[in-house]
Amino acid sequence: MVESATVVSGPSPPPRKRLSRILFVLIGIALLVAIAAAVAPWAFSNAALRNEVASQIRRMTGLATLAQGHAVFVVLPQPHVSIDDVSFTDPSGSLRIDAHYLKGYVRLAALLTGRIEISSATLGQPDMRIDLDGRPMPPDSVIGRAADAAPATPEAASADEARLGAVTLVDGRARLISKHLSPDVTIDAINVTVDWRKPGAAAIVTGQAQIRGETATIAAWIASPVGLLRGQQSPLSLKIVAPSLSFSVDGGLASVPEWQFGGYIRAATPSLRAILEQAGYAIPLPGPFGDFEAGCDAVVSAQSAVLSGLRLRFDGNEFEGTLAYQARDPAPVLSGTLATNRLSLRPFLSGVPPAAGRDGQWNRDPFEFREVGSTDLDLRISAAHMLFSHFELEDAAFSVMRNSGRLELALAGAKAYQGAIKGRVTFDLGDTGVGMQATGTVIGADFAALSFDAFGWPEFNGSVTGTANLESSGASMYELMRNLDGTAQIDVAQGQLGGIDLESALHRIDKSPLALLAGIHRGRTAFDHASFNLRFVKGIASIEEGKLENPSLWLGFGGTVDFGERGLDLHAVAKSAADAAAPGKEVPDFRFDIGGSWDDLAFTPDVRGLIRRSGAAAPLFPQKRDAGKPVVPSGDAGQ
């Protein structure tokens, strides 16, 4: 027996829903039929499509269109016209675009009335040549009429409402030329959309491009492009982000009487020097300028820039202040005032060749000045703490001035080593070398700390005061030191001479002259005052009027310091103060020499004189005394 099966179906849709679906399908079919009917006049005519698209582009932008490839109208998924091998030019020749293809997307409402009205376009692989000094928009275009309309007039209001659209560039390339650019700038891999719906609306630019092999993300907003074309101002926002640069501006842009931006600028880059050198500019200061960050209020034009409220950081240094740049003939000038809590000059000196070579002698390599560029400088900098090589300064105020081939570094004043210093050095930079003039003053500085940081000599202490006035010339550091001329004066008060006990030597010189050599280096010699003068002639400084005094001791010294060959030849004689005050009287004295290379000085006592004073050895020598080289005339001993 076979039982019949009953099939139970689901509930049928309500009549209202079935009607809605039917209406939706019918409307879709009707819309497709309407579109098909509307595009029928264009579907079979390449010439008609090309002419209509060219006419609209000419009407909006003023650009002439030349289409050499196939033109086709595509309905789905979005109605658009596709044309291959198309070119655009403006009448003045300022702009030329050669694109692999053009896709013009049309407005649906216009299409239903039988018209093609392009709302946006895509250019594939456009190759663009842009003359930044030209005016590519003719006056009979939508943009040209809007630009020529007087502000706040009915004509301007009408022109501002005309339709434009959006343009997308896919894998494009642009060559920018201008009298201000040398060489031309090439931008590759351009994938950017420019959305400017009508002249009176804002323009938005977004996308990416490649400059010198590096991809940058670009985002820009211009509130009133047509205002700029009419000579008015417009708010502007721009941001560029790339591996080597992050840059943003927010402010206002004006086009009359010249292009000028006013607003806030932020910039950051791993190497400012590399960025500027790629752009054809040289930083007129040494140093890597790495880890650069800056933020400031700025007024920037083609010929000048003023950066105020500047916060600047690079190479581990941070500054606040103002900078200004002015393009002028024969050289531009960078000026400003900066302040910092801590300034290290080590990064600025990192690329400077060492003064001395590995052999311990002065560097003979010729000076190179090409990296400093041609920009003139007028910079004034104050630093609460400044580190220069091994020297530490406080409350330093200095300036860097450059005018043509002359560079001047001036330290107006600073606290250092419990004293004060100031100085000035001027370099005249030439093709065959450099001329130098230097002056300096130190007042009341700690001689122990200063001599250790300067020369690595810990044997001296006291309060040092001195002046120097020097000049030289040469093509290398070696020549510069060999040609030193000038004078210097040094005074030291309330000090000690380490590594030698002269008072003990004088006390023992008659009793045990030979035995004193064993212990002379174990003590120190205190003094109330010491002084000497230096007279430089061709790199050799004569030590003049050298003396060291305390109530019981007088030391006279003289000799030469060879700055060219880094050598010292010093001769000294020590006497008791009472004996030194009695010229002509034969009194015990202790004589010694210090000589050799600066890096390996040798202390040499007058051994022959000590042996002569020894009673056991006296018969071995002539009775006429010859104790060595006199340092000062006996008549000057008490002076």
Residue ranges and their predicted role:
Residues 318-320:
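Long, internal scaffold/assembly segments composed of regular secondary structure
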Residues 15, 34-135, 294-298:
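Terminal hydrophobic membrane-targeting helix
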Residues 145-160, 353-365:
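Intrinsic-disorder/low-complexity linker and hinge segments
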Residues 78-98, 117-141, 165-168, 173, ...:
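Small-residue helix/turn framework positions
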Residues 310, 322-323:
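A structural feature that tracks compact, well-ordered secondary-structure segments
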Residues 60, 359-376:
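N-terminal leader/targeting segments and the immediate start of mature chains
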Residues 14-31:
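N-terminal Sec-pathway targeting helices
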Residues 1-19:
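N-terminal Lys/Arg-rich, disordered targeting/topogenic segments
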